Amino acid sequence: MSGDTGPSKQGGTRYGSISSPPSPGPQQAPPGGTYLGEKIPIPDTESGAFSLRKLWAFTGPGFLMSIAFLDPGNIESDLQAGAVAGFKLLWVLLWATVLGLLCQRLAARLGVVTGKDLGEVCHLYYPKVPRILLWLTIELAIVGSDMQEVIGTAIAFSLLSAGRIPLWGGVLITVVDTFFFLFLDNYGLRKLEAFFGFLITIMALTFGYEYVVAQPAQGALLQGLFLPSCRGCGQPELLQAVGIIGAIIMPHNIYLHSSLVKSREVDRSRRADIREANMYFLIEATIALSVSFLINLFVMAVFGQAFYKQTNQAAFNICAKSSLHDYAPIFPRNNLTVAVDIYQGGVILGCLFGPAALYIWAVGLLAAGQSSTMTGTYAGQFVMEGFLKLRWSRFARVLLTRSCAILPTVLLAVFRDLRDLSGLNDLLNVLQSLLLPFAVLPILTFTSMPALMQEFANGLVSKVITSSIMVLVCAVNLYFVISYVPSLPHPAYFSLVALLAAAYLGLTTYLVWTCLITQGATFLAHNSHQRFLYGLPEEDQEKGRTSG
């Protein structure tokens, strides 16, 4: 199966052992094949030469993917890391973004080479029980991400209305605005991608404005960015580092990106076209994640400058002397270090730099919440279709996800206070980190299979780097669990944690086992797991084509 052309049952070699037959026309995708049922044609240019026209044609999926790097959970993680550690964790943000890019590169390659997304490949290769458990974990990650978007949007509405819209009211508004944004589907793929680009621009301008007015110390900022150290750090700083990793590298985003790249018309019978598509998607993802990194850097630097080592009393005094003195009581009058969240963050910016800073912060937060809503909807639909072969309309899919997200959020908003809502945001960031192995292990497994990826399978360097990412994430998660268990409020919780830990370790062990098979540990392959070495049997391929 090497070379540009060759005989096969379909008249031409198709890369990826589970590839589907060619689509009937250059503009028409198979039903459900892309997120808008259409494909973007790629212009013909001089072979081997870089083309801005081609880069523009491939631009879109990477920026949609980058939205997950900018959701309200990321904003909360950024500002808390700045408030807790100053500039000391900027290097964690930088390298988490680089590691995220490496994972997204693998996701894009899988989609381009095989013509199927990660959920579809999992459906074909994993047995039923692990497959269902894996699907449930990714759905949990999607609901958790959606809860963060609901929280961020509700707080943005509260800030923009000067408190006239209560938090529970903001939560309910998110139901309406979500369905409004679904109407964007009717305006075509490129217009939808342009709208997401507009929201990213809003975030860059609003959070960039906060960076300019805060004027962080540039020397200390550069030192924190490029010197990986954390002098004097303890458990609070470590938990913030875990939160950064969980917020930046989100499990469902890997599944999302592997499906988004299918929206471009790539001739998978030609290895040159596949190689070219991989290159352009990598360039686009690098540009998109560079923008997202700068936006996250703006937020962390602003709060590292304005909030680091601030006490509640100091924050109270700052607001009491400002034009926003009515907000001062949200800060307790004590000398404890202030525990900032996305609501208090907007308030203190307004107290320090004027009301405009507060409203600009709220607009950026609103853009983060709204953009993440749409990408979360697409991720949920792709995951459900891929794992279960169950096709729902986006309306039904968003109704399910948003209902699961809103119920606990609105209960907290009604019966508890803002601090509990922000605390939930922090917990959800850690949840994303805990669930990350259920995306990284499958993508590493399948992109390392020569039977599936052929000449585009991971090389030794890629395997080592991605495996190192996985070991790092698992080590950090293990440390978090060991640190968290002693703080459980009641002994009865220990049995629940033990049950969840057993299920978690069982599924992780299975995924590691199959991953090791593809990395060269052939002695681990038995019976049906031979497919991880040699691809699917011919009859399984045919079933995959008819059901996929």
Curated annotation (Swiss-Prot):
Glycosylated sites: 335
Membrane association type: Multi-pass membrane protein
One term of GO molecular function: manganese ion transmembrane transporter activity
Cytoplasmic topological segments: 1-55, 103-139, 185-193, 257-284, 367-397, 448-463, 514-548
Subcellular location per the Swiss-Prot or TrEMBL entry: Late endosome membrane; Lysosome membrane
Biased segments, Polar residues type: 1-11
Primary location group: membrane
Native source organism of the sequence: Bubalus bubalis
Function noted in UniProt: Macrophage-specific antiporter that fluxes metal ions in either direction against a proton gradient. Localized to late endosomal lysosomal membranes, delivers bivalent cations from the cytosol into these acidic compartments where they may directly affect antimicrobial activity. Involved in iron metabolism and host natural resistance to infection with intracellular parasites.
UniProt keyword list: Endosome, Glycoprotein, Ion transport, Iron, Iron transport, Lysosome, Membrane, Transmembrane, Transmembrane helix, Transport
Cellular component aspect of the GO annotation: late endosome membrane; lysosomal membrane; phagocytic vesicle membrane; plasma membrane
Organism placement in taxonomy: Eukaryota, Metazoa, Chordata, Craniata, Vertebrata
Gene Ontology terms describing biological process: iron ion transport; manganese ion transport
Transmembrane residue ranges: 56-73, 83-102, 140-160, 165-184, 194-214, 238-256, 285-304, 347-366, 398-415, 427-447, 464-485, 494-513
Catalytic activity: Zn(2+)(in) + H(+)(out) = Zn(2+)(out) + H(+)(in); Fe(2+)(in) + H(+)(out) = Fe(2+)(out) + H(+)(in); Mn(2+)(in) + H(+)(out) = Mn(2+)(out) + H(+)(in)
Protein name as it appears in the record: Natural resistance-associated macrophage protein 1
InterPro entries: NRAMP_fam
Record family assignment: Belongs to the NRAMP family.
Positions in the Extracellular compartment: 74-82, 161-164, 215-237, 305-346, 416-426, 486-493
Pfam families: Nramp
Record region (Disordered): 1-38
